[in-house]
Amino acid sequence: KGVARRDLLAMLQAKRPWVDAKLRQQQQRMAVRPRYQYQTGERLPYLDTELTLHVMQGTRGACIREADTLHVYWSPRSRKTVPEQTAQAVAQWYRAEALRLLEAKTQRLCDSVGLTCHGVNVRATRSKWGHCTFDGRIQYNWQIVLAPTPVVDYLVAHEVSHLRHHNHSRAFWQHVHAICPDYQRLRVWLRDEGHRLILPPYER
């Protein structure tokens, strides 16, 4: 037991520089994660463009896009502050748009490669951008629509490929490459920049 314990301590000590580097990397990433005040004039990323917020009073909370403007209505009857209402309405709009977009892209790609998806849904997950179940359902992180369109297309190609290959084998990556030839560059982009793709709640 003593030898095993010494070996374990030695292994942990050897890995300490790697662990410290990862912790520093995470701290740096957290420092550059976006923070929004959810005020009129603020610009939010959406696919290949930016949307400008226009916040105004209404009878109830709502969010409507008109060209490159998001009109957000807040309710004076709500107990939440105006920025809190705005953040909530914006998140609901993004989530609904993500579901609409990802359902369409997934179905279109499935049709073109002869695969069947039994359902698409979206969530705000912390660790994964997408997930394909063994029964053919695909789940996406809705915040992927904060990324450029080619990155979104790569993610869809990745998850649709899992409908045929439920692993990350060579055959899987060959399938991804066949429908998204530039997948390696886009995969690296998502790995390196994914921490920026977030619409956080309002923080005072």
For each feature predicted by the language model, list its residue ranges.
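Walker B catalytic acidic pair
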Residues: 159
